Amino acid sequence: MEKLNNFDNFVNKNFKISIAFFALGLFFGIVYSINLLGFSLNSETLNPANMRAIHISLMLYGFIPLMLSYLPFLLINKEVGFDKEGLRYLNLYTIFWYIFLVFMVVSLLLGKNRGLAFYDFAYELNFLLALAGVFYIIALYKFIRLYKRFLYG
């Protein structure tokens, strides 16, 4: 893991990575739209139900939620700075979130499809989300502790 000593670099790096997931979701949305217009791709993997599930799931779990989850950290960083240990946990949260997104896309493309519009990925992937959530809570705790140091010296 690279040295994380600058919060701005962390956010910029992850913004660029997250844009790739946004573009992927947009791609699957366009493929689904083309299917709705009547141009059919004769593929078992790229069928309309899979495309819809991937597009909606990437919009619900991809770029926007991940960037919004950084908002408390951005506000704390603006007021009192950042905690290196908290940034390390935030990085772990982000890594597990990316792993979840990759497995979710693969699961929706190649796995059994129940025909749901979203949340059609394997339930076992919820473990990755829960683990990411633990790291998020720890990172938030480390960042919030900065207020105590800032206010009381």
Protein language model annotation of sequence segments:
Residues M1-G153:
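Hydrophobic alpha-helical transmembrane segments of multi-pass integral membrane proteins
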